[in-house]
Regions:
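Residue-level signal for tight coil/turn positions that link beta-strands
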Residues: 9-10, 56, 91, 180
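Terminal peptide-recognition signature
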Residues: 15, 19, 34, 52, ...
């Protein structure tokens, strides 16, 4: 079974995460495949818009931690980087339809989408701090740019879950709709976009994002360096061990004592 399924019709490329049994959690191979899909769609003259959604009851539960632990990212093996580059270069509209679990990268990837519909069941979370990690996908810039610094800091530094209504209030999603109407609503918008003049769509998106792209690239570069350091930190090792052992993490034992004066 393919972890990502695509179908193109009438100028719309449907991209569907297809690991419903894992809530569409991402593996390294899926990052690579998704990057290839977006790069190819960017060059395809018959693709005008991407419609992105997940199979089953969730959009994406972030990284598959089993795959993450067996294939930890590093400077020489970082499939997420290829997808980041593909997002930055992508010139066509991306319409996302999200429901259920929208966790970690499942949330940060949305900051690169142009229209985002959330089903009422959507539950978002940026839990990087709980894993002793840091923001990624350029979201240390793109999220504050979209919703403001204080709101972004609240989501990142506390790492707590929030619902679809809150996501709409923050400006992270375009609109909340009933789950049963989610895909139909997103499809209708994709059809409207596909009927617009493609050259004008791409030019408009470039203008809307002028200045934004260079800032995101700089953020990605900084994030990558810090992320690789954090993955190998004592705090991250404790967080991941605690997750696998189903216990609360104890970060006190990873803290360096302050020398007495």
């Amino acid at each position: 079974m393919n972890d990502i399924v695509t179908e193109r019709s009438n100028g719309i490329l449907r991209v569907q995460f297809n690991r419903p049994e894992k809530k569409n959690a991402m593996t390294g191979g899926m990052y690579t495949r998704l990057a290839d899909i977006f790069n190819e769609a960017n060059e395809d003259e018959e693709t005008f818009v991407v419609l992105w959604h997940g199979a089953g009851d969730s959009f994406c539960a972030g990284n598959d931690l089993g795959d993450f632990l067996h294939n930890p990212p590093g400077p020489d093996a970082f499939p997420q980087g290829a997808l980041m580059d593909a997002f930055v270069k992508f010139e066509k509209p991306i319409v996302a339809a999200v429901q259920g679990a929208v966790i970690g990268g499942g949330t940060t990837m949305l900051t690169h989408c142009d229209v985002v519909y959330a089903g009422a069941s959507a539950r978002f979370q940026l839990p990087f701090i709980n894993l002793a990690l840091v923001p990624e996908f350029g979201s240390s810039y793109s999220l504050p740019a979209r919703i403001g610094y204080l709101r972004a800091a609240d989501l990142y530094l506390l790492g707590e879950p929030f619902g679809a209504t809150r996501a709409a209030e923050l400006g992270l999603v375009t609109r909340v709709v009933p789950d049963r109407e989610l895909l139909a609503t997103a499809t209708q918008t994709a059809q409207k976009l596909a009927a617009k003049p493609g050259g004008a769509l791409r030019a408009s998106k470039r203008l809307l994002k002028q200045g934004f792209i260079e800032q995101v690239k700089a953020a990605m570069k900084a994030e990558d360096q810090v992320f690789f350091e954090r993955v190998r930190s004592a705090e991250a090792k404790e967080a991941l061990s605690a997750f696998l052992e189903k216990r609360p993490p104890n970060f006190n034992k990873t803290k360096t004592p302050v020398a007495a004066e």
